């Protein structure tokens, strides 16, 4: 053996893949034997159609070790220059309390959980999200709030469509007042274009001169100005115009709330509550509105219900509004939002409490007032006479020199766009990290003099709130609920967060076999760079020469994704898969426009498609035409051909998922692409199931034109209990000119660019996760992950086949990376539904698979490559044991109304009941398996009453009395 060979043998460069993939050679051999094949290659040959197999391996760099990857990422990060940021414009430096950093952001108990569709095992983060809603409702003085949106700009666009749905005006005009953040205007204009809305801009005082269905105001404005909106809103209402106000939660601790001025909707970002800027995200957007608009409000809403024992329990309310149910009639296409960030912001509010938040706001305002006093003493004029934390200097001949002098001193000011050779206005925003030294440095840089702040501080102290109009000063109380007034020591905070975490099921407890969700490992090494200051503290609108690190990261990741997908270009802007779909369909629409074919607005969608597909198509005012599926779950080719022929002249695109949502690799997918292309249409291939493609096939090779990727599925960004997500889109060469742009970076004299997110790179600070994953896995590791995901799904199918009907299989009797088992025959025989089985799985220590999608009365099971054979067996053993329990009901051994399934889940309180009246034992109820005795996860409530929750909607924190009742 040569030294080189020995070194290769001892190398740790491929170690990450062996840790990410859950099964080794011996385990794989056992699974292959169960399936009945000799090798994993034979299984893949039987599963993936030969026509779509890649002819050669992906050209990716050799895998790197964890230490090498982190070192290379650190080198990239260090190319970012993190100046002191005074840019503002919706993004501010924050101080994330270490107790939240350590116990939430860096805690897999929080970041690996899934969206709380199973409320009995999600009470912790449901409570935290309810706190978030209460926080937003209190600060905005509105009646109901959601539990989050993707960012402030998206929230503004959603508020526009809410105004149209909820209002009585027949107008198609929407007013965007001067003073809105430019990136918000960009996203709103994009959304308006495809609904056929006219955007009218101007001074808010002119609002009532127009016939409008809605208006968007900013308070405080982007220049920092503050004015009472009451009279303006009253005039708008007199003309049946609904008003949305974009606001700042920290400012609202001192300023009169928009709800008190009559606002119909209040939107914004919770970023200021402890969330790093992260070059644009992720951050939780918020929306609050009036009770009467609750059923047309977008986003997930947490509500208070009760469980089967009558005790208070939380759940996601009014889910029938969501895209997976309402499809093209949904209020929005958004699925993943920003749950993890919303939780962090809520904890920030709890930790500081109302007095602590007000103290932070007072300090920020006080420092701003000192800065203003110093500038005025030297004759500088402000564009805004009133302010909270932001001021705008009127243009003068020294403005450019001041801007560059600040840059030289490591300070970023905001430069307002002005015509060439004209003086620029400068914006300055302070935040909770600003010190008196920073203020003195700003005064010196701007005035050219070393001014002492002491005299100005004394002057300001005489009238602390002189910068805020008397009519705009907050007098109402907020955050009065006990939950915001109890957890101010680190010990209390740590224990409260742990209490909530302990209520929830996450990947720290066991596999989460949700089909179409890809709940794989989020390795610790991947998460580390997220909180590095070089990534986390960058302002998204910092000068380009300061963000070379992010630019390099984006370029390298885009090239990796192009290689993996077979596409030619990528945009990393979309903040979620749904937003990626939206951007992809816009690219298709713009492409048709460029060819003079505006009439192409028909979108073909298979009946099995995820609900986001028709919901997104509707956002572009496309006409959705549904294509049927055959009994095997495949797209009905005859029906597809007929509808292509019928709509040939107006066909825009087809949206397909591959492998299909039925969990199989459909034969003939390339022919489908060809038929659509022959008719002049484009192919949108939904990337939700990309985990079954990498290294074996690719969207580009199959023949599609555009796809979004769920980086929070396939590429290891954690789900976070419902966000953050990332949904970048890849396109073929002809669609590259139609990818999203951004007003801050895109040169577009004809204003034809469009934006779907507030920042150019969306949630940029989590991009290192996917970069590191690909770098550490390499071609072989990624391909192996795909193969093992397919192996695991087929192993589960074979183990469950004798006990449950398998609904769909491919040509050779195989499934892709997920399989669907049919519960309907069992329900017909026993009365036991898939919901009963889902709740019983909790007693066995599992999260349920996906319920009733894509077919009602079924389970879709996706194990992912990260699970060991032992974990797969534990799940299969649980499902088989449950089948035996169902048999006892069928045989009459247990009553149909009193058995372990209909009473599931069982709690610790159930175990300790003084009288046990059921026809089965306590042990069977609570400890049905050996594993449940060794390591028991306990649901904290009994089955939640969904109907009661929607009929008696409560979306605020319960009273202290209800907590005592628990």
From Swiss-Prot:
Assigned keywords, A-Z: Oxidoreductase, Pyridoxal phosphate
Residue numbers carrying N6-(pyridoxal phosphate)lysine: 713
Biological process according to GO: glycine decarboxylation via glycine cleavage system
Gene Ontology molecular function: glycine binding; glycine dehydrogenase (decarboxylating) activity; pyridoxal phosphate binding
Pfam families documented for this protein: GcvP2_C, GDC-P
Superkingdom classification of source: Bacteria
Catalyzed reactions: N(6)-[(R)-lipoyl]-L-lysyl-[glycine-cleavage complex H protein] + glycine + H(+) = N(6)-[(R)-S(8)-aminomethyldihydrolipoyl]-L-lysyl-[glycine-cleavage complex H protein] + CO2
Xref: CDD domains: GDC-P (cd00613)
Reported cofactor(s): pyridoxal 5'-phosphate
Classification via InterPro entries: GcvP, GDC-P_C, GDC-P_N, GDC_P, PyrdxlP-dep_Trfase, PyrdxlP-dep_Trfase_major, PyrdxlP-dep_Trfase_small
Family: Belongs to the GcvP family.
NCBIfam families: gcvP, PRK00451.1
Cited function: The glycine cleavage system catalyzes the degradation of glycine. The P protein binds the alpha-amino group of glycine through its pyridoxal phosphate cofactor; CO(2) is released and the remaining methylamine moiety is then transferred to the lipoamide cofactor of the H protein.
Subunit field text: The glycine cleavage system is composed of four proteins: P, T, L and H.
Protein name: Glycine dehydrogenase (decarboxylating)
Organism in which the protein naturally occurs: Psychromonas ingrahamii (strain DSM 17664 / CCUG 51855 / 37)
Gene that specifies this protein: gcvP
């Amino acid at each position: 053996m040569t030294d080189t060979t020995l070194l290769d043998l001892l190398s740790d460069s491929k170690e990450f893949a062996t840790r990410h993939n859950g099964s080794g050679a011996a385990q794989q051999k056992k699974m292959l034997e169960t399936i009945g094949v000799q090798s994993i290659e034979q299984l893949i040959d039987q599963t993936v159609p030969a026509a779509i197999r890649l002819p050669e391996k992906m050209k990716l760099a050799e895998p790197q070790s964890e230490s090498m990857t982190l070192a290379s990422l650190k080198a990239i990060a260090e190319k970012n220059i993190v100046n002191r940021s005074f840019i503002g414009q919706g993004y501010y430096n924050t101080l994330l309390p270490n107790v939240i950093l350590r116990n939430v952001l860096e805690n897999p108990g929080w970041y690996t959980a899934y969206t709380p569709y199973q409320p009995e095992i999600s009470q912790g983060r449901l409570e935290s999200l309810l706190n978030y809603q209460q926080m937003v409702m209190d600060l905005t003085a509105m009646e109901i709030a959601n539990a989050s949106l993707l960012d402030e700009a998206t929230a503004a666009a959603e508020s526009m469509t809410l105004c149209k749905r909820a209002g009585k005006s027949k107008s198609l005009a929407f007013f965007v007042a001067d003073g809105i953040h430019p990136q918000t205007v960009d996203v709103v204009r994009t959304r308006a274009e495809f609904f056929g809305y006219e955007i009218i801009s101007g001074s808010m005082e002119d609002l009532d001169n127009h016939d409008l269905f809605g208006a968007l105001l900013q308070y405080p404005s982007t220049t920092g100005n503050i004015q009472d909106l009451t009279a303006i809103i009253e005039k708008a209402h007199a003309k049946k115009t609904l008003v949305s106000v974009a606001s700042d939660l920290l400012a609202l601790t001192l300023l009169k709330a928009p709800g008190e001025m009559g606002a119909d909707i209040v939107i914004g970002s919770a970023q200021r509550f402890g969330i790093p800027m992260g070059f644009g995200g992720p951050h939780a957007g918020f929306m609050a509105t009036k009770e009467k608009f609750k059923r047309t409000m977008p986003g997930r809403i947490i509500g208070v219900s009760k469980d089967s024992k009558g005790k208070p329990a939380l759940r996601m309310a009014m889910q029938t509004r969501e895209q997976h149910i309402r499809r093209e009639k949904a209020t929005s296409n958004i699925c993943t939002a920003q749950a993890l960030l919303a939780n962090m912001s809520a904890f920030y509010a709890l930790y500081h409490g109302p007095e602590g938040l007000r103290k932070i706001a007072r300090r920020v305002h006080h420092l701003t007032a000192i800065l203003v006093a110093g500038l005025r003493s030297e004759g500088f004029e402000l564009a805004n006479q009133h302010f909270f934390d932001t001021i705008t200097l009127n243009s003068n001949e020294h403005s450019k020199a001041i801007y560059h002098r600040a840059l030289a001193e490591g300070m970023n000011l905001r430069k307002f766009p002005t015509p060439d050779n004209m003086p620029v206005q400068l914006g300055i925003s302070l935040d909770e990290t600003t010190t008196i030294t920073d203020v003195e440095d700003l005064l010196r840089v701007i005035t050219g003099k070393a001014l002492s702040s002491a005299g100005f501080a004394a002057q300001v102290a005489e009238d602390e709130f002189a910068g805020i109009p008397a009519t705009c000063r907050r007098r109402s109380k907020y955050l009065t609920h006990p939950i915001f007034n109890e957890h101010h020591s680190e010990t209390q905070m740590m224990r409260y967060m742990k209490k909530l975490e302990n209520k929830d099921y996450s990947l720290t407890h066991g596999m989460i076999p949700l089909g179409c969700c890809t709940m794989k490992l989020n390795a610790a090494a991947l998460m580390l760079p997220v909180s590095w200051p070089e990534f986390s503290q960058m302002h998204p609108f910092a000068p380009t020469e300061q963000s070379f690190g992010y630019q390099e990261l984006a370029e390298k990741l885009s090239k990796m994704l192009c290689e993996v997908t077979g596409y030619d270009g990528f945009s990393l802007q979309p903040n979620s898969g749904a937003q990626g779909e939206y951007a992809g369909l816009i690219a298709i629409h713009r492409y048709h426009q460029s060819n003079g074919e505006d009439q192409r607005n028909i979108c073909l969608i298979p009946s099995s498609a995820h609900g986001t597909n028709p919901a997104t198509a509707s956002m572009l005012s496309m006409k959705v035409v549904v294509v049927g599926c055959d009994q095997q779950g495949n797209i009905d080719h005859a029906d597809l051909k007929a509808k292509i022929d019928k709509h040939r002249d107006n066909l825009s695109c087809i949206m397909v998922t591959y492998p299909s949502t039925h969990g199989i690799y459909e034969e003939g997918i390339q022919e489908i692409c060809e038929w659509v292309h022959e008719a002049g249409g484009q192919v949108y291939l939904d990337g939700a199931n990309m985990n079954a493609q990498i290294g074996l096939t690719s969207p580009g090779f199959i023949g599609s034109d555009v796809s979004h990727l769920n980086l929070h599925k396939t590429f290891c960004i954690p789900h976070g209990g419902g966000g953050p997500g990332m949904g970048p889109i890849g396109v073929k060469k002809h669609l590259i000119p139609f990818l999203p742009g951004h007003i801050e970076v895109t040169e577009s004299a004809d204003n034809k660019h469009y934006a779907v997110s507030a920042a150019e790179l969306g949630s940029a600070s989590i991009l290192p996760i996917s970069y590191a994953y690909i770098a550490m896995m390499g071609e072989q590791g990624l391909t192996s992950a795909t193969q093992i995901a397919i192996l695991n799904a087929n192993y589960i199918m074979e183990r469950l086949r004798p006990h449950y009907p398998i609904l769909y299989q491919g040509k050779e009797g195989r499934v892709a990376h997920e399989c669907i088992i049919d519960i309907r025959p069992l329900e017909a025989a026993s009365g036991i539904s898939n919901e009963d089985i889902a709740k019983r799985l909790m007693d066995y220590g599992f999260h349920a698979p996906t319920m009733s999608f894509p077919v009602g009365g079924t389970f879709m099971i996706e194990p992912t490559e990260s699970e060991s054979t032992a974990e797969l067996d534990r799940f299969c053993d649980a499902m088989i044991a449950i089948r035996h329990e169902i048999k006892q009901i069928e045989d009459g051994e247990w009553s149909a109304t009193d058995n372990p399934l209909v009473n599931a889940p069982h709690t610790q309180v159930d175990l300790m009941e003084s009288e046990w009246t059921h026809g089965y034992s306590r042990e069977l109820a609570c400890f049905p398996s050996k594993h449940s005795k060794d390591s028991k996860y306990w649901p904290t409530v009994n089955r939640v009453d969904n109907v009661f929750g929607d009929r008696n909607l409560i979306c605020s924190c319960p009273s202290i009395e209800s907590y005592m009742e628990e």
